[in-house]
Amino acid sequence: MGSGGVIHCRCAKCFCYPTKRRIKRRPRNLTILSLPEDVLFHILKWLSVGDILAVRAVHSHLKYLVDNHASVWASASFQELWPSPQNLKLFERAAEKGNFEAAVKLGIAYLYNEGLSVSDEACAEVNGLKASRFFSMAERLNTGSEPFIWLFIRPPWSVSGSCCKAVVHDSLRAECQLQRSHKASILHCLGRVLNLFEDEEKRKQARSLLEESSRQGCLISSYLLWESDRKVDMSDPGRCLHSFRKLRDYAAKGCWEAQLALAKACAGGSQLGLEGKACSESVCQLFQASQAVNKQQIFSVQKGLSDTMRYILIDWLVEVATMKDFTSLCLHLTVECVDRYLRRRLVPRYKLQLLGIACMVICTRFISKEILTIREAVWLTDNTYKYEDLVRVMGEIISALEGKIRIPTVVDYKEVLLTLVPVAPRTQHLCSFLCELTLLHTSLSIYAPARLASAALLLARLMHGQTQPWTTHLWDLTGFSYSDLVPCVLSLHKKCFHDDAPKDYRQVSLTAVKQRFEDKCYEEISREEVLSYADLCSTIGVKQESPEPPSFPSSGEIHTFLSSPSGRRSKRKRENSLQEDRGSFVTTPTAELSNQEETLLGSLLDWSLECCSGYEGDQESEGEKEGDVTAPSRLLDVTVVYLNPEEHCCQESSDEEAWPEDKIHPAPGTQAPPASAPRPLLCNRGDRAKDITTSGYSSVSSSSPISSLDGGMGGSPQSTSVLSVGSHSSTKPCHHQAKKSCLQCRPPNSPESGVHQQPVKRQNLSVHSDKDMHLAS
């Protein structure tokens, strides 16, 4: 009953239920923390260690994930970061959690005493034990490639005092005696090291180590034992057949060296009881498994790199390989390492030469008996870089390539073809010449290495007028028909012979490969007249297309960014030169001086090269780099702009240009070299700009570091680009019409002023030190 005695019913008209208030749900805020942990791990993986520490500080849950899951540290990136006292704990933690890059860099840092200075008197022993620990970790984590740590501790070892390499070797050997698992690769490395000694006792120990490694499943150790026994096994038919079966087993398991040896062994297939068809199928499988890797991807990663700049770098590496008499395989592996690194990591332009020479140091140690030492490599760059720069970039390279150095190359397939097919010596040299030229052009990388090698052999036989350049036997061996190879042959001819080679800023053509094959050991094959493109098309039976335009920019667009290898040596051919024969130019450090100067300089050069080349100079494990090179007084910006020589004060021009134009008179007591003689190839480091007409390259620094010897080093070498006799440290502006830009100008230090540049202890000027301190805080 309501008010006033009125009775209300509960119908919808008289009675209303209170309406329900609908509460709006707040939208759920989704953040990165809302993701499943598996997804978070994928996000955290491959971040740099600095980013991981920054993420760790954001939230307690992220902190928990970073601190309690090893996979985050195992995949953390330490790119461009080197071990130092400030970040040592981060490196050690990552290495213990399974980070390959951290383990490699720690091992190299302790071995070369770079970045982690030890003030203990027994520096070699302390560092050697620590390096051994992290090298062992790195080898244990290296599951996809051959054992590699032996290349860092291979001889020569120091004969005076303690040697860090020897300490690492002994420590690893002791570890193998105690540890029962994961030691096959370590045993292989120990065996490889001892096998390089001349001592017969050490070689016996090396064989026993390799046998133990083979029993524990190391495939490459098994192949090395097979190779050492091959000569003995081939003398007996029964043992020969058993040896061949073992080789076939190793090849089937994926050993690349065994696959190559098996393919070459098919040349004597009848002796092994194999039918011709079975041999052809075995070789064909090898060739058809070859895959192309498009090197044009380099330029999508390296935005500041051009094809011409890469051409200049590879040309310089060819010149170094020629000077040091390295094999074509070593050169090809070096270039492959450079290209693989460029596809994976950014490289500033001023570090290209450092990358190239570091790859050569690694490859020579991995496959050659004669090595390129770190000191000599620094010298070859005209001391543009320092000892520690090269040591650190070696760690970056091994980390980026994940320890995989040996990969299939064009040379491998070429050697197989030349073993299986009878080819005239000059045709073999021409085929090798063509294979070497393929290194210079990234556009040819669209073809697999096996196809390139086959096309090189076909083109060589065509150029030498073979009536049957590609037989059915070659078709069966490679799986490539004549028509399959025609496009590759045409591209090869265009790039190697039709397109002009790029020129440096001095209008000098970069032809190091051509000069390499002008040697008599190659029967001067590069001097041979080349079959024209029209005649080639006519011989092949295809319609001639308009040749592609040269892909290289004009000389005005080419900037210098490399230093001449050791030296200011040049066999380049200047197109506008009046000299028709420049073949007399040599690639070894020589100079056209007076008799007295030649005697003094020759003695100094002999001493320097004796100390710093080959095995005798690689005493890098004693901390000998300390005090080796002084820090440069200043650095030149690598962005080089071409300047009008009439408007800019440059230093003296090269001897080729200055003598005929300026009529420079020799200093009293010296003999002026004739105009047709090679220019001096050794000069004062402080006066390096006087010789900027090197073999197509110029140093990036305005003044080279001054070398000094550590007092306790004894016979450790100085850089061989030392003060030449009769040179003056003062420089004067040139007043002639120079044909090049002035890239290196430094204030004169007159000898009469009595002011001498004092060597200072090398300091670490790396840019990552601030970051290290930040990460450790």
Swiss-Prot record:
Pfam families: Cyclin_C (PF02984), Cyclin_N (PF00134), F-box-like (PF12937). SUPFAM superfamilies: Cyclin-like, F-box domain. A motif (D box 1) lies at residues 310-313. Residues 751-767 have a biased composition (Polar residues). Residues 29-76 form the F-box domain. A motif (Nuclear localization signal 1) lies at residues 20-28. Residues 768-777 have a biased composition (Basic and acidic residues). CDD domains: CYCLIN_CCNF_rpt1 (cd20521), F-box_FBXO1 (cd22082). Residues 288-405 form the Cyclin N-terminal domain. Belongs to the cyclin family. Cyclin AB subfamily. The nuclear localization signals mediate the localization to the nucleus and are required for CCNB1 localization to the nucleus. PANTHER family: CYCLINS (PTHR10177). Component of the SCF(CCNF) complex consisting of CUL1, RBX1, SKP1 and CCNF. Interacts with SKP1. Interacts with CUL1. Interacts with CCNB1; interaction is required for nuclear localization of CCNB1. Interacts with CCP110; this interaction leads to CCP110 ubiquitination and degradation via the proteasome pathway. Interacts (via the Cyclin N-terminal domain) with MYBL2/BMYB. Interacts with FZR1/CDH1 (via N-terminus). Interacts with RRM2 (via Cy motif and when phosphorylated at 'Thr-33'); the interaction occurs exclusively in G2 and early M. This is Cyclin-F. It comes from Mus musculus (Mouse).
